[in-house]
């Protein structure tokens, strides 16, 4: 290696060909003229670099040529920046241009730019005229240390990056570090990812240099440029040194292995996994950032395989974090730039399969065995199973299989001691060397914060075994807010540390913040104590929690400090450790009762003594401590004891499996209270415990022999209660009948990472273990491990390391493997716990990704209890009952529950005790409901529940933890009208008007709710039915049970109707005809005209009522669209925040689909995507500016990345100027599948573009001739599109039939021909009457056979010709619909049954949407009775009574159905029981007996009795259906009508089941209302 003042050369492949230095332009140009003589030099660069450097280099090259007396041509080519330029077309464009410039084989190409320019221009050089000379002039740090060195050149293809290229060595590489001055900070840091990678993989000495200098390097990187000054001047030598180290390594490796025979792929450390992430996250996330994440994952893989020590993972991770590189896809940096993108493990592994390092199907990854040293001299073969464990969000733990009997496990260093030691060492004078430090998220957060505060610097010795802390007790105002994630210990300790920051000339503030969970954890008592001591601290969000803002003053004043310490001992330790640096000695008084966790306070005092400060406990005052004013002195070396709380898990492993385990460095002399766990908990449970001062050994009893603990106080080891709870679940070896363990003294565990007591109770239930909360503890009913259930939905861990590890112990004895969700939560205290399970305990693990990770406390949304809030009179009780019925939950009115509890009425309570007392009682009832009934209930709150701040906080917390708080909104005028006639409620306090109360509470309702349900204004018709229909759609979306989307995208053609009315009420009358054939309806919110708006766009309230009106009018999904002006709509682009507000509101309304324009800001897109839950998103882009071309779709493809990331469906809309535009679009549609599997809506606007609408097959926007105007130019109707497809041959003519005899009078042909005419289908429907079922055989085999209905007598006989049956047809044992289907290219005939569907639809249309909790009656026991019973069960009937003249036949029908159908046969011969039957109140009745056959008198009497008693106020919901229709009004209908039933004859069922068959055959829906009138007129003519 040679060097001069400004440049250092590094040899590669036997030549001095890589030069690293400053101001190299003259050297570069002289090199070209002297060593690369040519008639033409071609400089290729991009538009980012050209303005800064191109003229400078062309001038320098011209001057060099003059100096040498030559006159070559100097040509320049400037191309667009970015990865999209690294493609075949750009390469061809440059080559064609070079040919046009008469470039020959002596041409020399100069690649001046980043990796894209170097790779692409290098590949041009490799292939132009079979290879020309070139040099690399890298302008980014990443290119300098990576892509420019080694001769790799390539371009990207649609299938992946760098898949086409060549090895072509440059003549030279010039890394001119002056280029870095104009490099954006993020791009510089991106390059640091590669620098760190090289050092971590190859040279620990280089890595140490990087570890020691992040602050000074980042300060220079972020320093603003000043003309005439080099921004890196103060780190000039350091910068060159770290870049040289990386360059030197790469040159050395390339020299040894130019063509990647094995050694060179070591340079791909971090890339196997990093490239997989990059394939998904690029371009939002940069290469070096992805490699950073990949490094961490590959380090974790090395550790998981038992090759790399845990501290090495922590060390490299901290180094990456110190340079602000992301270390996880969950980092804030990733969320900021690409938070909307998902990285499914299956996809990552699939991408990893395409890696040049692989050996066939075997994946190879660079595995490290130490920092600076690889496991092998080439990438190591690793199984997909092991990779999946590291990459997966969740982990599956298999039961113990007796593979080990005696194990020694050393837990990581104590989190409590590690964090205290970091604080004390940072404040101490001198250098402290810490060993056995815990490497975890918590300690990394603490170290990063202390560095940012200027308190200490950190470095590593002994290959990462020793942390060297250079402290001194001086603090400065940090340059940014201190993000503490979910590190509660760090938050509490650093709050007081931050108070020591003194005033400075620059001013500033200290902000402590954290993640969502951290922002609800308490810190109020500590803040109160510090405020009282003169500290300026304010809450930035929630009172009593982070984030905090602290204004530096004169530090801690000192003197007497009073602190409430009954919640957390960490408050005490925080003040104790900082007290010596107060302005005067401190007397710390703990007030409010007995302090919690005294042993942790004692630990802190003992550690302070080790650093030279003695705390004196008062002998005269309880819980009082005297701390002198002093400075800490470093003890030099300080060994951190292993974490005693963590030690409980391996010891519990021994206890539950009957094996032996030793923890060698925790014993009876430990400072930690949890060290008593073995002696005080495991021994009484039946374990043999041996404990020395420094070690603990546990031998468990035989499996199943653990003893329950009647009562154990765990106040001195509260964190260990979770481990004890897991063991107690299978502790049943006792003499008594009850195997109950009671654990007390752990109240503080309710305010840890989560409410741990509630969490354990909830998750134990998944194992079938009964448990419950005590005032300060938990009780657990132990049972045999053989009786445990395997939790089907997995164990939710609440982002709590101890919950995860405790349940990992219990899963060892479950029947089958158990999934533990969010495995990464253990990084807080034992990052490699899963590795220990695998390597030490030989437990089989598997990485899994749950389809939908359960949300907090508990519950998937589908079973979460629903809490209703809203004004009195909004309809909470009515809607609550509907929700309970539809979700099969129980309904509670919390006002009524309060009255029961206090044995009084609310008006009396208010009159006697006042509103304040009432509100407190109301709050208590709500708290009890959430604590005890968080699933399977619906609760209506009183309208004023939001008046109480604590209640609002409770509701908000419930939402954050996964519960549903539904705000019921009703038009204010309607509420006022209703309340004016309702006198049963107490007057508001101070006789306040209802309107004022509404206005005051309205924002509180909005603050507390997770969703909104706007009650529709229904002027006429069946109000209850429409309300139930609206609620049904809402609930299907909110609970994730909606399946329409999946069905719609699988159909050959699907459509949605575009509504463009200024007021939806004007559209209602058009809808029955307009929605024919449609799968959804689009509500264009931007076109609504709010009469009260002065802004030019409608208010949220107005749109809400319009949305509710539409949802009540149709039973179709709604697509909600706010189209901006730039995209062809009316909503002002300048009012983006208001547009986002509307879209977020639509999500809360449970809208089925949201159209999300890609033109909104990334922040808006992310905000909406983050809250989408079960709503589907169409990401749309309308090329109204006509900048995109289907023929050259680069612009479309640039949109595609973001469209697929945010959307479930992509919608691209162009403008057709010629018919060719439509054909180009189809070519794009075909190629689209190579980019993504997301559905595509792609159309052209305008009349010329109509053909594109015909070709589009997924959710094509349509109009209808029934509407007064179209929504967009060129829009077609469903009928027009289907007609066009038919004319083109895309839809072939088909023939449909009715099989049966006699069928001459059937009206089925009329029905189906009407439907064909309405939709444009080229189909026919005919009667096929045959005396034998054999007659249909030839028809079934015809190629144009489209389907058939089957009636008597062939519903059973037809089965012999069918290949398969639907589940319903198989269950009912009869077929009335034959459907030809294609499966793997083979035609099959499928039998279905729509009889039951016809019955269900008839009841729904009549208003009986849901029979939950109600009784039903079926009369008759023939074939149709089965369909009727099936339909009643589908509608949710509680009991289904069956009445038939012949009891034995009724019993036969009953025997067909499972027990859960609750079919009960009525014995009509027992006339003495008639009085009992009148009490049944059957809400739904289906008669299946012929109308012309008189019933026995005993049967008639029973029917009359059964129908006689129905609630007068609910008569419209009681429906009688007679399957007979000759005559139209049957005798039984007359009886039912007399008693108040809504009566329907069988003609409607025939129509409904026929429409159901039509939908099955065609995929198109025709609304019943549109064909009903015509059908009934024709049928009436026939009967009359």
From Swiss-Prot:
Its cofactor is Zn(2+). Residues 1059-1280 are annotated as: 3-dehydroquinase. 7-phospho-2-dehydro-3-deoxy-D-arabino-heptonate binds at residues 130, 146, 152, 162, 194-197, 250, 264-268, 271, 287, 356. Keywords: Amino-acid biosynthesis, Aromatic amino acid biosynthesis, ATP-binding, Cytoplasm, Kinase, Lyase, Metal-binding, Multifunctional enzyme, NADP, Nucleotide-binding, Oxidoreductase, Transferase, Zinc. ATP binds at residues 870-877. Residues 863-1058 are annotated as: Shikimate kinase. Residues 397-843 are annotated as: EPSP synthase. Binds 2 Zn(2+) ions per subunit. The active site is at residues 260, 275, 825, 1182, 1211. NAD(+) binds at residues 46-48, 83-86, 114-116, 119, 139-140, 161, 179-182, 190. Its EC number is 4.2.3.4, 2.5.1.19, 2.7.1.71, 4.2.1.10. Its main location: cytoplasm. Residues 1-384 are annotated as: 3-dehydroquinate synthase. Pathway: Metabolic intermediate biosynthesis; chorismate biosynthesis; chorismate from D-erythrose 4-phosphate and phosphoenolpyruvate: step 2/7; Metabolic intermediate biosynthesis; chorismate biosynthesis; chorismate from D-erythrose 4-phosphate and phosphoenolpyruvate: step 3/7; Metabolic intermediate biosynthesis; chorismate biosynthesis; chorismate from D-erythrose 4-phosphate and phosphoenolpyruvate: step 4/7; Metabolic intermediate biosynthesis; chorismate biosynthesis; chorismate from D-erythrose 4-phosphate and phosphoenolpyruvate: step 5/7. In the N-terminal section; belongs to the sugar phosphate cyclases superfamily. Dehydroquinate synthase family. PANTHER family: AROM/DEHYDROQUINATE SYNTHASE (PTHR21090), PENTAFUNCTIONAL AROM POLYPEPTIDE (PTHR21090:SF5). Homodimer. This is Pentafunctional AROM polypeptide. The lineage of its organism: Eukaryota, Fungi, Dikarya, Ascomycota, Taphrinomycotina. The gene is aro1.
């Amino acid at each position: 290696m040679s060097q001069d003042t400004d440049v250092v050369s590094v040899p590669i492949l036997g030549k001095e060909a890589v030069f690293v230095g400053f101001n190299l332009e003259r050297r570069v140009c002289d090199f070209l003229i002297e060593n690369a003589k040519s008639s033409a030099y071609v400089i290729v660069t991009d538009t980012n670099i050209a303005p800064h450097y191109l003229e400078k280099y062309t001038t320098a090259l011209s001057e060099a040529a003059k100096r040498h007396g030559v006159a070559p041509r100097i040509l320049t080519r400037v191309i667009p920046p970015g990865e999209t330029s690294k493609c075949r077309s750009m390469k061809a464009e440059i080559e064609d241009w070079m040919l046009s410039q008469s470039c020959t084989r002596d041409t020399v190409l100069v690649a001046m730019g980043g990796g894209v320019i170097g790779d692409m221009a290098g590949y041009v050089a490799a292939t132009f005229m079979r290879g020309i000379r070139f040099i690399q002039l890298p302008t980014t740090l990443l290119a300098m240390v990576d892509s420019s060195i080694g001769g790799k050149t390539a371009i990207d293809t649609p299938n992946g990056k760098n898949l086409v290229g060549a090895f072509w060595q440059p003549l030279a590489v010039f890394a001119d570090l002056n280029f870095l001055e104009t490099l954006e900070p993020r791009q510089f840091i991106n390059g640091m990812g590669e620098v760190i990678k090289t050092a971590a993989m190859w040279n620990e000495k280089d890595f140490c240099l990087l570890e020691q200098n992040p602050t000074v390097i980042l300060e220079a990187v972020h320093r603003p440029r000043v003309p005439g000054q080099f921004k890196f001047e103060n780190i000039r030598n350091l910068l060159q040194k770290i870049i040289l180290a990386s360059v030197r390594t790469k040159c050395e490796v390339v020299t040894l292995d130019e063509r990647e025979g094995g050694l060179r792929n070591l340079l791909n450390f971090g890339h196997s996994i990093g490239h997989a992430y990059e394939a998904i996250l690029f371009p939002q996330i940069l290469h070096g950032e992805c490699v950073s994440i990949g490094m961490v994952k590959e380090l974790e893989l090395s550790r998981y395989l038992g090759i790399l020590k845990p501290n090495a993972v922590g060390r490299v991770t901290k180094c990456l974090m110190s340079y602000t590189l992301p270390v996880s896809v969950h980092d804030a940096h990733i969320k900021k730039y690409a938070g909307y993108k998902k990285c499914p493990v299956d996809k990552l592994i699939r991408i990893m399969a395409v890696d040049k390092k692989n050996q066939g199907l075997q994946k190879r990854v660079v595995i490290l065995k130490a920092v600076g040293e690889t496991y092998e001299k080439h990438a190591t073969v690793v199984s997909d199973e092991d990779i999946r464990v590291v990459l997966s969000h969740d982990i599956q733990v298999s039961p113990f299989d007796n593979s080990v009997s005696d194990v020694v496990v050393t837990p990581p260093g104590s989190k409590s001691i590690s964090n205290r030691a970091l604080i004390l060492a940072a404040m101490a004078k001198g250098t402290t060397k810490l060993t056995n430090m815990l490497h975890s998220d918590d300690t990394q957060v603490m170290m990063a914060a202390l560095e940012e505060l200027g308190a200490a610097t950190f470095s590593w010795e002994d290959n990462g075994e020793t942390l060297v802390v250079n402290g001194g007790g001086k603090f400065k105002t940090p340059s940014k807010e201190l993000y503490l994630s979910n590190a509660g210990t760090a938050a509490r300790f650093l709050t007081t540390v931050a108070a020591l920051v003194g005033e400075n000339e620059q001013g500033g503030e200290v902000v402590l913040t954290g993640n969502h969970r951290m922002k609800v954890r308490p810190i109020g008592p500590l803040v109160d104590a510090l405020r009282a001591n003169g500290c300026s601290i304010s809450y930035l969000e929630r009172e009593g929690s982070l984030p905090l803002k602290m204004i530096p003053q004169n530090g801690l004043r000192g003197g007497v400090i009073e602190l409430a310490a009954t919640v957390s001992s960490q408050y005490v330790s925080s003040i104790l450790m900082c007290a010596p640096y107060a302005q005067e000695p401190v007397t710390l008084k703990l007030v409010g009762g007995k302090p919690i966790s005294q042993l942790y306070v004692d630990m802190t005092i003992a550690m302070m003594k080790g650093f030279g400060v003695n705390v004196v406990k008062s002998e005269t005052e309880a819980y009082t401590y005297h701390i002198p004013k002093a400075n800490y002195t470093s003890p030099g070396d300080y060994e951190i004891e292993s974490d005693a709380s963590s030690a409980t898990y391996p010891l519990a492993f021994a206890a539950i499996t009957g094996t032996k385990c030793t923890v060698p460095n925790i014993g009876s002399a430990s400072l930690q209270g949890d060290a008593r766990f073995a002696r005080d908990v495991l021994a009484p449970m039946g374990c043999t415990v041996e404990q020395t001062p420094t070690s603990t050994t546990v031998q468990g009893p035989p499996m199943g022999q653990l003893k329950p603990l009647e009562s154990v106080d765990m106040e001195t080891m509260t964190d260990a209660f979770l481990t004890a709870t897991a063991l107690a679940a299978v502790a049943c070896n006792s003499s008594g009948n009850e195997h109950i363990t009671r654990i007390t003294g752990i109240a503080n565990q309710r305010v840890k990472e989560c409410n741990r007591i509630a969490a354990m109770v909830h998750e134990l239930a998944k194992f079938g273990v009964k448990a419950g909360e005590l005032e300060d503890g938990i009780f657990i009913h132990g049972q045999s491990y053989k009786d445990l259930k395997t939790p089907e939905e997995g164990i939710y861990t609440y982002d709590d390391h101890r919950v995860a590890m405790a349940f990992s112990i219990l899963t060892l004895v479950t029947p089958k493997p158990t999934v533990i969700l969010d495995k990464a939560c253990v990084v807080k205290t034992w990052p490699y716990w899963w590795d220990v399970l695998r390597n030490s305990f030989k437990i089989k693990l598997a990485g899994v990704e749950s389809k939908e990770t359960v949300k907090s406390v508990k519950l998937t949304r589908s079973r979460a209890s629903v809490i209703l809030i809203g004004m009195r009179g909004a309809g909470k009780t009515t809607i609550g009952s509907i929700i309970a019925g539809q979700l099969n939950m129980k309904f509670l009115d919390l006002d009524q529950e309060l009255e029961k509890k206090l044995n009084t009425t609310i008006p009396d309570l208010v009159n006697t005790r006042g509103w304040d007392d009432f509100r407190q009682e109301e709050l208590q009832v709500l708290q009890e409901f959430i604590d005890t009934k968080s699933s399977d209930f619906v609760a209506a709150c009183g309208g004023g529940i939001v008046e109480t701040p604590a209640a609002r906080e409770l509701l908000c917390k419930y939402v954050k933890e996964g519960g549903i708080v539904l705000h019921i909104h009703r038009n204010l005028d309607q509420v006022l009208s209703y309340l004016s006639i309702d006198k049963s409620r107490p007057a508001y306090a101070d006789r306040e008007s209802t309107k004022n109360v509404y206005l005051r509470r309205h924002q509180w309702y909005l603050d507390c709710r997770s969703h909104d349900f706007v009650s529709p204004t229904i002027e006429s018709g069946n109000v209850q039915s429409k309300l139930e229909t609206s609620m049904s759609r809402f609930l299907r979306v909110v609970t994730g049970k909606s399946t329409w989307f999946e069905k719609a995208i699988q159909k050959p053609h699907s459509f949605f109707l575009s509504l463009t009315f200024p007021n939806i009420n004007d559209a209602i009358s058009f809808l029955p005809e307009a929605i024919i054939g449609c799968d959804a309806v689009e509500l264009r919110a931007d076109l609504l005209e709010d009469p009260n708006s002065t802004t030019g766009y409608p208010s949220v309230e107005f749109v809400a009522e319009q949305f509710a009106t539409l949802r009540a009018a149709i039973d179709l999904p709604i697509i909600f669209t706010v189209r901006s002006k730039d995209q062809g709509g009316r909503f002002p682009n300048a009012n983006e925040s208001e547009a986002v507000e509307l879209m977020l509101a639509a999500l809360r309304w449970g809208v089925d689909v949201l159209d999300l324009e890609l033109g909104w800001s990334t922040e808006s897109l992310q905000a909406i995507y983050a809250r989408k839950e079960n709503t589907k998103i169409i990401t749309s882009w309308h090329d109204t500016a006509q900048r995109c071309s289907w023929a050259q779709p680069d612009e479309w493809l640039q949109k595609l990345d973001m469209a697929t990331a945010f959307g479930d469906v992509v919608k691209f809309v162009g403008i057709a100027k010629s018919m060719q535009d439509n054909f180009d679009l189809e070519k794009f549609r075909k190629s689209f599948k190579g980019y993504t599997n997301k559905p595509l809506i792609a159309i052209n606007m305008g009349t010329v573009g109509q053909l594109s609408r015909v070709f589009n097959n997924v959710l094509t926007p349509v109009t209808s001739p029934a509407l007064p105007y179209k929504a967009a130019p060129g829009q077609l109707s469903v009928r027009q599109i289907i007609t066009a497809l038919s004319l083109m041959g895309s839809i072939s003519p088909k023939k449909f039939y009715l099989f049966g005899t006699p069928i001459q009078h059937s009206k089925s042909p009329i029905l189906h021909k009407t439907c064909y005419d309405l939709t444009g289908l080229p189909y026919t429907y005919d009667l096929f009457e045959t005396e034998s079922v054999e007659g249909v055989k030839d028809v079934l085999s015809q190629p144009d056979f489209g389907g058939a209905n089957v009636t008597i007598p062939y519903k059973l006989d037809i089965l012999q010709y069918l290949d398969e049956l639907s589940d319903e047809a198989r269950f009912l044992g009869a077929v009335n619909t034959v459907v030809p289907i294609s499966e793997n290219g083979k035609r099959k005939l499928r039998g279905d049954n729509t009889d039951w569907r016809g019955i269900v639809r008839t009841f729904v249309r009549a208003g009986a949407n849901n029979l939950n909790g109600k009784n039903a009656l079926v009369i008759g026991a023939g074939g149709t009775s089965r369909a009727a019973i099936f339909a009643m069960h589908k509608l949710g009937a509680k009991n289904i009574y069956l009445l038939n003249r012949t009891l034995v036949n009724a019993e036969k029908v009953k025997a067909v159905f499972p027990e859960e159908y609750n079919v009960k046969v009525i014995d009509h011969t027992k006339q003495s029981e008639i009085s009992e039957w009148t009490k049944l109140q059957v809400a739904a009745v289906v008669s299946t007996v012929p109308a012309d056959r008189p019933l026995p008198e005993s049967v008639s009497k029973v029917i009359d009795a059964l129908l006689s008693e129905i609630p007068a106020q609910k008569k419209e919901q009681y429906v009688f259906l007679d399957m007979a229709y000759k005559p139209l009004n049957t005798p039984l209908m007359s009886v039912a009508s007399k008693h108040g039933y809504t009566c329907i004859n069988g003609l409607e069922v025939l129509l409904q089941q026929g429409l159901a068959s039509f939908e099955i055959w065609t995929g198109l829906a025709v609304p019943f209302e549109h064909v009903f009138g015509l059908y009934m007129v024709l049928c009436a003519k026939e009967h009359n």
